[in-house]
């Protein structure tokens, strides 16, 4: 099918010039439109519509279809309109048909178009023959065709415009007939038809466009009003939602605060109960501890009483062990108030003249008693309740080696009994050398002479300590707080000198 490439007004003008049938094919995107388009593209249809047909194809979504539908209502899609010279639709095909059916319809339209053309020629001849004798019955015939053409070509919903145009055309025709010029009017009719129709179509299209613009403006205004109304409603709805949300949040917060307060109250009550329970438990514990402490104090008091009684009993007696130079020893008990002279006399009576003139001394602490000490009490000399005293023969130092008595018998006995004597000395030193704790209190409550004696003993020990430190200085080398043994190289290191960069100078 050869489709006209141009707008609808140009296609109408081309059809008018050639006296052809104006074909308008309104197609869409559906399946029927595709089938109908295929029928139009068929070779049979192309051959049948090659002469006396000006065809144009428009889309339903285009502006041309909108303009065309304002004159010829488009009922369904697809649609095919066959419009004659007068603007009257000769045939309208609604929907999709086959190619053969379409060829049949085209032939039918050709017959209708040719018959209408002959009728129009006959009417023109009759009008020319009757120009000399005009009558009243001719007037409606002369103006019938323009009126019908105008009505058929411009058939739209706006019927008031068509009626006004028809009335105007009628008046013009009547005026011409009364002025005895029917022949001139009939000659100008073909030229006027096309111009008037095009002008009317253009004017009506402009009016329709203006109405459409106004309608669009009104529609936009309504849309804007609706949009504003909808926006206001949405804002109101959102505000209500926000208010409800805020209200719910406040209620939730109030409920949470109430729950927090209740939880805090429960915690406070639990803390108070725990404190009361701990206080009661602590009081019970304190009472139990106080009872235990009282029982312990009572027990300790009883123990102290026993100790004091034992100490008093023991403090009244001084047990003295006399150790002889040959390693033997003997023991005797004396009153604690007895002087040391009594103990010396007992030792002299026991040993006789074996060791001659001797003196008494203690080894731990090391002390040799003088003549003045013999007059003092055993308690004052810290020899009560027990002590170990060594007999020192005259002329021998306290640290001298003890020799056995003359005679092979004593040597043999000393050799045999020496292990037993050593064991006995260890046991006796362990048992009798250190006084019990009760003696410390007795010593603390001793008189002033005992303090003076201890001070004199400490004064005697000072020279010995100094000599030991001097001797230690010879054997050890002090480096800060560390002592190390001296070697042969230490003397050489002390004689050497060192410079600032740790290099030895000889």
Curated annotation (Swiss-Prot):
SMART domains: UBX (SM00166)
Membrane topology category: Peripheral membrane protein
The keyword Membrane belongs to this UniProt entry's keyword annotation: yes
Residues with PTM Phosphothreonine: 487
Tissue: Expressed in many tissues, including brain, heart, kidney, liver, muscle and spleen (at protein level).
Biased amino acid composition, Polar residues: 120-136, 153-167, 496-506
Gene3D superfamilies assigned to the protein according to its UniProt record, in alphabetical order: Glutaredoxin (3.40.30.10), Phosphatidylinositol 3-kinase Catalytic Subunit, Chain A, domain 1 (3.10.20.90)
Compositionally biased intervals (Basic and acidic residues): 457-489
InterPro entries: Thioredoxin-like_sf, Ubiquitin-like_domsf, UBX_dom
GO CC terms: endoplasmic reticulum membrane; nuclear envelope
Region Disordered, residue ranges: 110-194, 437-506
GO biological process, one term: ERAD pathway
Functional summary from the UniProt entry: Involved in endoplasmic reticulum-associated protein degradation (ERAD). Acts as a platform to recruit both UBQLN1 and VCP to the ER during ERAD.
UniProt name for this protein: UBX domain-containing protein 4
Species assigned in the record: Mus musculus
């Amino acid at each position: 099918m050869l489709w006209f490439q141009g707008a609808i007004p140009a296609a109408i003008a081309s059809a008018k010039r050639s006296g052809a049938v104006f074909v308008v094919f309104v197609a869409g995107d559906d399946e029927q439109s595709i089938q109908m388009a295929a029928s139009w593209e068929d070779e049979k249809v192309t051959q049948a519509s090659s002469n006396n047909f000006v065809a144009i194809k428009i889309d339903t979504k285009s502006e041309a279809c909108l303009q065309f539908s304002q004159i010829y209502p488009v009922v369904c899609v697809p649609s095919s309109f066959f419009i004659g010279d007068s603007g009257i639709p000769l045939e309208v095909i609604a929907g999709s048909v086959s190619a053969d059916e379409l060829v049949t319809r085209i032939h039918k339209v050709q017959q209708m178009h040719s018959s209408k053309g002959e009728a129009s020629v006959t009417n023109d001849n009759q009008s020319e023959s009757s120009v000399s004798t005009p009558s009243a019955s001719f007037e409606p015939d002369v103006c019938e065709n323009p009126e019908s053409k105008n009505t058929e070509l411009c058939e739209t919903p706006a019927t008031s415009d068509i009626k006004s145009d028809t009335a105007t055309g009628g008046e013009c025709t009547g005026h011409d007939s009364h002025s005895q010029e029917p022949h001139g009017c009939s000659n100008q009719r073909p030229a006027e038809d096309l111009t008037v129709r095009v002008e009317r179509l253009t004017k009506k299209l402009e009016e329709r466009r203006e109405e459409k613009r106004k309608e669009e403006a009104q529609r936009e205004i309504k849309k804007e009003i609706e949009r504003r109304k909808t926006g206001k409603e949405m804002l109101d709805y959102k505000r209500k939602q926000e208010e409800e949300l805020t209200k719910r949040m406040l209620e939730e917060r109030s409920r949470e605060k109430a729950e927090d307060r209740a939880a805090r109250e429960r915690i406070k009550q639990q803390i108070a109960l725990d404190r009361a329970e701990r206080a009661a438990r602590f009081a019970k514990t304190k009472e139990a501890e106080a009872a235990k402490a009282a029982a312990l104090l009572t027990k300790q008091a009883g123990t102290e009483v026993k100790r004091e009684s034992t100490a008093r009993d023991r403090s009244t007696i001084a047990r003295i062990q006399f150790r002889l130079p040959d390693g033997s020893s003997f023991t005797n008990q004396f009153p604690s108030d007895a002087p040391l002279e009594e103990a010396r006399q007992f030792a002299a009576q026991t040993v006789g003249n074996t060791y001659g003139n001797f003196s008494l001394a203690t080894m731990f602490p090391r002390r040799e008693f003088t003549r003045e000490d013999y007059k003092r009490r055993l308690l004052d000399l810290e020899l009560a309740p027990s002590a170990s005293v060594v007999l020192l023969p005259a002329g021998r130092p306290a640290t001298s080696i003890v020799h056995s008595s003359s005679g092979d018998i004593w040597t043999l006995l000393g050799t045999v009994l020496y292990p037993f004597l050593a064991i006995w000395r260890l046991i006796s030193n362990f048992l009798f050398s250190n006084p019990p704790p009760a003696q410390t209190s007795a010593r603390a409550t001793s008189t002033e002479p005992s303090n003076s004696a201890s001070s004199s003993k400490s004064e005697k020990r000072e020279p010995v300590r100094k000599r030991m430190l001097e001797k230690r200085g010879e054997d050890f080398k002090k480096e800060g707080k560390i002592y190390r043994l001296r070697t042969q190289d230490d003397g050489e290191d002390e004689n050497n000198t060192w410079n600032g960069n740790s290099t030895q100078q000889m």
